[in-house]
Every structure is written in C-alpha cells, then in structure tokens.
Amino acid sequence: MSTNNEIEFKQLIDFNTYNAIKASYFKQLTPFTQINYYIETPSFKLRDHRSALRIRVKQNTFEITLKVPAKVGLIEYNHPIDIKPHIGQTIVKSTLPNDIQKILTEFDIGENELSVLGALTTERLEVEFQNELLVLDKSQYFDKTDYELEFEVNDYEIGFEKFQNLLKQFNLVHEPPKNKVQRFFEYQAQL
C-alpha cells in the first residue's frame, strides 16, 4: 500500500506536438500499455466529491487507486488488488482496502453501489527530466484518441516554472485540461 501527494501539471497536445516531444525527449524509449478501468456510482458520487476510483492493469498487475483532493494536488491511495476488472462489473465496497472503504463510506457510497463503467487504454512513455518525471501519453477510449504531456513534481512552484519552460520550447501556452477520468465520462455522455 502507498499513499502519496500527487502534484502534476498536464497539457493536452495535438498529434504533431506529441511526435515532436517524443522525438526530443523519448527517442530511445518504448511505450508501455496500461488500461484504466473507471469505477463510479450510477449517480456519480465520486465525481461530486472531486474524486476518482480506478483499477489500473499494467504488465499483468492490478492496482486500485482512489484519488481525493488535497491542499495542493491530490492524495492517492494505491493498493495492489486481485480484482480482474471488466466493464459492467459490480465492485463490492467491503472487498476493497480499509482506507479506501473508509473514504467511500464518508462519501455515502453503499456496499454494492460501485461498478466499472468503462476503460481507457494508454500508451505511456516516461523519462526523468530535471529531477522530475516527464510523461507522454497517447490515450484511447471509445472512438477517441488524445495526447497529453504530464509533469509529476515534488514542489508546486519549482515544478510549474520547469513545466512552463518546457511548454515554451514547443510554443505551447499552459491550458490545464480536465483529467482523463473527466474526459472519459464527458465523452461517454455524448455517445
């Protein structure tokens, strides 16, 4: 189990910018694939608490993550888990790790109220950049593909300055995007 304070900056980019950043910072790297299975209630109680719950499948491992707001960034509760998710599956609250159960109870989420509502597949590249983690994602959900640059940092102010300088190299102006789970559910609602 791990709990961490996630501070990251994100920027949606187009296909050409994705390729330019890939050529500049990720030349020799091979992407890995991960699938996020998004879990919610029918009435979107997690969203209403500005939180998200997912099971991530990566290299035949399964990890459940609950993200909740913090003063700066998000608090992530991460646990390895044995649940092999599929769309439509009910996730029984009492089978989840205790710290996640506790927060879900605080959100007034019932025992059988959670289910897997969809999946998003990401091809991810990661590299250390100025003592931080630079991430380049190509994500696919339904018939949509989007490209995103992420920069995970330890200090908000210093990290933001580094991110701004990185964006300037590609003539980008920082426009904080909605996160993947928000984009996923908003796009799903349009279908």
Question: Where on the chain are the PLM-derived regions?
Answer:
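Phosphate-end processing signature that detects enzymes handling 5′-triphosphorylated RNA
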Residues: 1-191
